[in-house]
Amino acid sequence: MKPNSEEEEELVQGVGPWDECFEVAVQLALRAGQIIRKALTEEKHVSTKTSAADLVTETDHRVEDLIVSELRKRFPSHRFIAEEATASGAKCVLTHSPTWIIDPIDGTCNFVHRFPTVAVSIGFAVHQELEFGVIHHCTEERLYTGRRGQGAFCNGQRLQVSRETDLAKALVLTEIGPKRDPDTLKVFLSNMERLLHAKAHGVRVIGSSTLALCYLASGAADAYYQFGLHCWDLAAATVIIREAGGIVIDTSGGPLDLMSCRVVAAGTREMAVLIAQALQTINYGRDDEK
């Protein structure tokens, strides 16, 4: 369902020092969604990055260039962390400066195959604290937003996480990550097996970490975990989950480290701890050390 003009106006209004930034992020996410929807049906030129499963297309670059160039015009003193720029060698460092954290297409493999779970993700941090997140589910025209202290919404409707605390009643989401070597796959499958042995209702992989986290924020799932995601996958969604009443932590059970390439999120702390305790770690290094 596409947000109507009244809903868009409600989404971009607010009280706080970053209102203009939020408004621009919403409009850019909607513009990016139009580009992606059109490109979804067209022939794509696909290349790989870190592995055969880590894909990039010309649309990833086009959308990232649009978002970053427009933001630079409006906010020339701000810093940027963006997926494709980082893949090309840009340093991934979160400072105290106002910083935009951008994934132009989350779910690129889905996009290549025309599987309709694809999103644009724009996060914003100041003094290393996440202020807001905007995620546009392009194919369904769902706009997820969260602002620190102001709640989380989808097309203007307030989001609320599940309050489930029993793993045996939980639907858990995850993603595979780009590593596909035998040892990594063994641990990935073992983690799923542990949760299923604990009688979880199910474990799902949808091909987009940002949208999986949005589904968690909306109460459609009870928990999410992953090794191998990046700060641009996580930044916007973290604000949305927290503002929907959920918790986002490290897989060790400690506080979230945005650069650690690992996460557990849930509607309740009890659920997050249960998931974290069940997991065996897969080491992907850190975003700020690559």
From Swiss-Prot:
InterPro entries: IMPase, Inositol_monoP_metal-BS, Inositol_monoPase_Li-sen, Inositol_monophosphatase-like, Inositol_monophosphatase_CS. Pathway: Polyol metabolism; myo-inositol biosynthesis; myo-inositol from D-glucose 6-phosphate: step 2/2. It catalyses: a myo-inositol phosphate + H2O = myo-inositol + phosphate. It comes from the Eukaryota. It comes from Rattus norvegicus. Substrate binds at residues 83, 105-108, 207-209, 226, 233. One of its GO terms (biological process) is inositol metabolic process. Its cofactor is Mg(2+). GO terms for cellular component: cytoplasm. Pfam families: Inositol_P. Mg(2+) 1 binds at residues 83, 103, 105. The keyword Ligase does not apply. It is an enzyme of class 3 (hydrolase). Its EC number is 3.1.3.25. Keywords: Cytoplasm, Hydrolase, Lithium, Magnesium, Metal-binding. It is found in: Cytoplasm. CDD domains: IMPase. Belongs to the inositol monophosphatase superfamily. This is Inositol monophosphatase 2. Mg(2+) 2 binds at residues 103, 106, 233. Homodimer. One of its GO terms (molecular function) is metal ion binding. The keyword DNA-binding does not apply.
